[in-house]
């Protein structure tokens, strides 16, 4: 799995929009409100992209 899949979710401090993050413990992707700035690479625009990248 890519490094992004190892990171915890980080929403960031600005305006929010929907995105998806990977939970390593659950081996699943979940929606969250991303702020549009800050955060980390564990952020995907769709559930499908998240699952395709990270879910084993």
Curated annotation (Swiss-Prot):
Residues 5-56 form the BPTI/Kunitz inhibitor domain. It comes from the Eukaryota. Belongs to the venom Kunitz-type family. It is found in: Secreted. It comes from Dendroaspis viridis. Its main location: secreted. One of its GO terms (cellular component) is extracellular space. Expressed by the venom gland. Disulfide bonds join 5-54, 14-37, 29-50. PROSITE patterns: BPTI_KUNITZ_1 (PS00280), BPTI_KUNITZ_2 (PS50279). Exploits its two major loops and engages more positions in its interaction with V2R. The pharmacophore defined by numerous amino acids positioned in loop 1 (9 to 17) and loop 2 (33, 38 and 43) may be at the origin of the absolute selectivity of this protein for V2R. The keyword Nucleus does not apply. This is Mambaquaretin-9. GO terms for molecular function: serine-type endopeptidase inhibitor activity; toxin activity. Interacts with vasopressin V2 receptor (V2R/AVPR2), probably in a selective manner. Inhibits vasopressin binding human V2R in the nanomolar range (Ki=45.1 nM), and also potently inhibits vasopressin-induced cAMP production (IC(50)=111 nM). In vivo, intraperitoneal injection of this protein into rats increases diuresis, without any loss of electrolytes. SMART domains: KU. Keywords: Disulfide bond, G-protein coupled receptor impairing toxin, Secreted, Toxin.
